[in-house]
């Protein structure tokens, strides 16, 4: 099976072997992202056709943790990027550095991001750098 995604910059085709699970990586960082993506993450994690991993940047740690607990979500990777008084550039840089390691380790077929946050930007950019298609919810 092949999934063809007409990308904004260039078209992308992902070839998938039907006998192997599709490797998906969902990236979250804020409470609204986790709230809206929780049902999707739970379904993908329970479906044997997918090998799903969840990475959080914890851009909004306390609020994110509340929602993760409420929906019983567990991150496979926690980048824990936040530091006192850091700029958006520093948040982006720390996210990209952490996501680079996760992308190398998990080698996803598709990356899922949500919304319009710094985490979303970093997740999509990291996937692009690794030539991995992005699905934006």
What are these regions (language model features)?
Residues 25-28, 33-43, 67, 81-137:
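Active-site and donor-binding regions of nucleotide-sugar-utilizing enzymes
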Residues 48-94, 98:
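Conserved nucleotide-sugar phosphate-binding/catalytic loop shared by glycosyltransferases and other
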Residues 8-58:
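N-terminal subdomain of nucleotide-sugar transferases
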Residues 14, 42, 54, 60-61, ...:
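Aromatic-residue detector
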